[in-house]
């Protein structure tokens, strides 16, 4: 049976991004986001639930996020879940985190809640490319990570049976 591991989250950074480099030279950015959800409680009152998620980005995506985002910045992240397990004081522990494969900065300049360098909401897709060929991030609204993917291709939505007016949202 096939499996599917995909997550999409939109929230705000709860702390500044920690950027480090692996011995191979690949950038790794680690941060967490808060995702707010409003729902109606059984008594009819609206309540807000907050969930916190640890996010890890790799490669150029990590560098862009570190350069333009800071605590409070809104962000959209798409990726996959990964469970880390370890042992501490003889007890097995585990934590589920998100390996971000794509991210998008939300909002414009000055709307990001303190985006670093004044470009907190500036989409990476509009950044100039220093090389001759278009960068991957310039071909879409997302900044793509250099992480290996569990699948080689994604559905494009152009195949048979795709009818845009039938989308329920």
UniProtKB/Swiss-Prot annotation:
Ranges of biased composition (kind: Gly residues): 107-122
Record-linked InterPro entries: NA-bd_OB-fold, Primosome_PriB/ssb, ssDNA-bd
GO cellular component: nucleoid
Superkingdom of the organism of origin: Bacteria
Domain SSB residues, every copy: 4-107
Keywords: DNA-binding
Keyword Lipid biosynthesis applies: no
Residues covered by region (Disordered): 82-169
Pfam family for this entry, one: SSB
Molecular functions (GO terms): enzyme activator activity; single-stranded DNA binding
Polar residues compositional bias, start-end: 137-156
Subunit structure: Homotetramer.
HAMAP family tied to this protein: SSB (MF_00984)
PANTHER family recorded: SINGLE-STRANDED DNA-BINDING PROTEIN (PTHR10302:SF27)
UniProt-recorded name of the protein: Single-stranded DNA-binding protein
Lineage: Bacteria, Pseudomonadati, Planctomycetota, Planctomycetia, Pirellulales
Gene name as annotated: ssb
């Amino acid at each position: 049976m096939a499996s599917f591991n995909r997550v999409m989250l939109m929230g705000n950074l709860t702390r500044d991004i920690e950027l480090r480099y692996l011995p191979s030279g690949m950038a790794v950015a680690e941060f967490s986001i808060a995702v707010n959800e409003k729902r109606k409680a059984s008594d009819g009152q609206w309540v807000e639930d907050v969930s916190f998620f640890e996010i890890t980005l790799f490669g150029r995506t990590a560098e862009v996020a570190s350069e333009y985002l800071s605590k409070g910045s809104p962000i959209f992240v798409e990726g996959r879940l990964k469970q880390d397990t370890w042992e501490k004081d003889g007890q097995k522990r585990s934590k589920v985190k998100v390996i971000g494969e794509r991210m998008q900065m939300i909002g414009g300049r000055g709307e990001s809640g303190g985006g670093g360098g004044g470009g907190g909401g500036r989409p990476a897709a509009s950044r100039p490319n220093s090389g001759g060929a278009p960068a991957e991030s310039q071909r879409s609204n997302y900044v793509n990570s250099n992480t290996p993917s569990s699948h080689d291709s994604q559905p494009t939505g152009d195949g048979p049976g795709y009818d845009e007016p039938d989308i329920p949202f």
